[in-house]
Swiss-Prot record:
EC number(s) from the headed UniProt entry: 7.1.1.2
Protein's gene: ND5
Protein name: NADH-ubiquinone oxidoreductase chain 5
GO cellular component, one term: mitochondrial inner membrane
A biological process term (GO) from this entry: electron transport coupled proton transport
Major place of residence: mitochondrion
Organism: Allomyces macrogynus
Reactions the enzyme catalyzes: a ubiquinone + NADH + 5 H(+)(in) = a ubiquinol + NAD(+) + 4 H(+)(out)
Lineage: Eukaryota, Fungi, Fungi incertae sedis, Blastocladiomycota, Blastocladiomycetes
């Protein structure tokens, strides 16, 4: 049964990819959607057996040996524990809803079969990533989701921006993939195996410096795939793909692969304090950076993309604080309300005939009441307002950060609280600009606006239910947050005893403010948005600051330009690399090395040939006769002497 969870998406991809034209549009949609839905049902049953009943324990399914050489061993084997089966539930359930949603969203597209086959391929590789029992098998899934992401972002390949975005996503992630490869080599060198259990057992006997090097390489991989500060530039650009792709890949699954990698590598990171500090700092800086950047975005999907980047920062710095259960709790909750936000945005874009600029919207609350309700639920959950899904996990992260009583804990707590204010501000901004005020779009478009069809509305409704209740259910009835073995994933992570908080997060502090600062921060962000957006034009009038002392304008200007990361990469790294490559090719490759190699050898042979031609080809028969005698004598002497 457990292997069927993985193989069904592969079956759907192969079937539709090979005979999709014969099956037709409807047949391809039925096969892919039904396969993913069955996979989701089986994942839920596996979750019931492994997590709720808790009578099976981790399940390892061994297929065959893969590699068994000196110093390296790996098998084709799959590992189902509380972490992997929960990830299977997230991936398969959201993928099934995205498949259903895409039936309506992609209606009329001439390449529907190709789109659904790509979705199924991505789902297969993501399930392979989270269920493999070793790092090498995880790497196969890691590369597979990268290729699938490229294909889906570039699905509308006739659009230049889609071509650029897919290439950017692929190239930026190459940096992270290099980190994974180096970390994988380090794991094989240190442990002789890439199995999670083997690595976790032997790690405690190795020197800290070796573990630190390996974990830093794995951190680079996580930074690339989870769009953390420095390698984040691909995520907003990836919004050029179809909106269902954004919901599946860039909100709920692919971008969480880096978080999953650190979570699986917790026995290593726990033994490398330097790496944990790096994880903590990078995550907290990513959260505040992405939030401030999202403030001044006009594209609806880009706003949600930057919010994804910011929420991933929360998860990463929670991992850096060794609070793996809380980070995984937020990963689980975030997947559902962020998928709801993206699919709701897709309904708006679908209704407005592909318009994504919020400045050209407005007044949609009476025209699209169902869509407004859905995106409102998702936004409130993102703001972490009480009793919604995001409230339980996001506040838990901030509370455990405060409970560390360390510099890193205080640093992340206050940055996270400030980020909560900004998140509430830009979420409110998106709602106000899109649904309230005077319509700013074309009258022709507004006259044809309609609600999404039923096949698109059902996934939205189901995700809204999850965005309201799933946080409460998992928090109170599944004991996701717990000390020691009380959390449902505690058996899958390795946390040092010194890193346990020693008490539940509900009792971190008796101070009223500590537990309620995040809520006050969110309410402050909503209030500021209502005040500032009375005149929305001022919000978008970003000009270059005249003086360095005008810090407000500087912040607004830098945020609106995404802190110039793309410009720096293009002008310094790319242009500099191309310039250096040109100089190297001209002076070294075609210059010095060419003189030592082909051109120099050619010239030497020509010179020698001319010398002998002049000295030997004299036209005198005695000279030729002497050469005929000398050459055989020379050959005989060279053989026998």
């Amino acid at each position: 049964m457990y292997l069927t969870i993985i193989t069904l998406p592969l079956f759907a991809f192969l079937t539709v990819g090979v005979i999709g034209r014969k099956l037709g549009v409807r047949g391809s949609q039925i096969i892919t959607s039904l396969s993913i839905i069955i996979s989701a049902i089986l994942s839920l049953y596996g979750f019931y057996e492994i997590v709720l009943l808790n009578n099976l324990g981790p399940i390892t399914i061994y297929l065959s040996p893969w590699m068994n050489v000196i110093g390296a061993h790996a098998d084709w084997a799959f590992y189902f524990d509380s972490i992997s089966i929960t990830m299977c539930v997230v991936v398969s359930s959201i993928s099934s809803l995205v498949h259903l949603y895409s039936i309506g969203y992609m209606q009329g597209d001439p390449h529907i079969q190709r789109f659904f086959s790509y979705l199924s391929l991505f789902t297969f590789f993501m399930l392979l990533l989270v269920t493999g029992n070793n790092y090498l098998l995880m790497f196969v899934g890691w590369e597979g989701i990268g290729v699938s992401s490229y294909l889906l972002i570039n699905f509308w390949f006739t659009r230049i921006q889609a071509n650029k975005a897919s290439m950017q996503a692929m190239l930026v992630n190459r940096v992270g993939d290099l980190g994974f490869v180096l970390g994988l080599f380090g794991i094989f060198w240190l442990f002789g195996s890439s199995d999670y259990d083997t690595v976790g057992i032997i790690a405690y006997k190795l020197d800290e410096q070796y573990i630190t090097i390996v974990t830093l390489f794995l951190l680079i991989a996580a930074i690339g795939k989870s769009a953390q500060l420095g390698l984040h530039t691909w995520l907003p650009s990836a919004m050029e793909g179809p909106t269902p792709v954004s919901a599946l890949i860039h909100a709920a699954t692919l971008v969480t692969a880096g978080v999953y990698l650190i979570l699986r590598s917790s026995p290593l990171f726990e033994l490398a304090p330097t790496s944990l500090i790096c994880v903590c700092v990078i995550g907290s800086l990513t959260a505040i950076f992405a939030a401030t950047t999202g403030l001044f975005q006009n594209d609806l999907k880009r706003v949600i993309a930057y919010s994804t980047c910011s929420q991933l920062g929360y998860m990463v710095f929670a991992l850096g604080l060794s609070q793996y259960e809380v980070a995984f709790f937020h990963l689980f909750n975030h997947a559902y309300f962020k998928a709801l936000l993206f699919l709701s945005a897709g309904s708006i874009i679908h209704a407005l005939h592909d318009e994504q600029d919020m400045r050209k919207m407005g007044g949609l609350v009476n025209i699209l009441p169902f869509t407004y309700t859905m995106i409102l639920i998702g936004s409130l959950s993102l703001m972490a307002l009480p009793f919604l899904t995001g409230y339980y996990s996001k506040d838990a992260i901030l509370e455990v950060a405060y409970g560390q009583f360390l510099v890193t804990g205080t640093f992340t707590y206050w940055l996270g609280t400030i980020t909560a204010t900004i998140t509430a501000f830009y979420s409110s901004k998106a709602l106000i600009l899109g649904f309230f005020g005077t319509p700013n779009g074309s009258k022709k478009i507004y006259n044809t606006i309609h609600e999404a069809p039923l096949i698109m509305s059902i996934p939205l409704f189901l995700l809204s239910i999850c965005s309201i209740f799933i946080g409460y259910i998992t928090n109170k009835h599944l004991s996701v947050i717990g000390i020691g073995s009380s959390g449902i994933i505690s058996g899958g992570v390795g946390t040092l005893r010194d890193h346990y908080l020693g008490f539940d997060i509900e009792f971190i502090s008796t101070s009223f403010g500590v537990q309620f600062y995040p809520l006050f921060a969110s309410l402050l962000g909503i209030s500021l948005a209502l005040i500032v957006l009375k005149d929305p034009k001022k919000m978008h009038s970003i000009e270059k600051p005249e003086g360095l002392l005008n810090t407000v304008n500087i912040t607004r200007w830098l945020s609106s330009k995404s802190y110039w990361f793309d410009n720096v990469y293009n002008t310094v790294l790319i242009s500099g690399s191309l310039h250096f490559g040109g100089i190297f090719a001209r002076d070294i490759d075609k210059g010095f090395l060419s003189l030592l190699g082909p051109q120099g050898l050619q010239q030497l042979l020509i010179t020698i040939s001319r010398f002998f031609a002049i000295k030997i080809d004299t036209g005198f028969i005695p000279h030729y006769a002497s050469i005929i005698i000398i050459i055989p004598i020379f050959i005989i002497l060279s053989i026998f002497i």
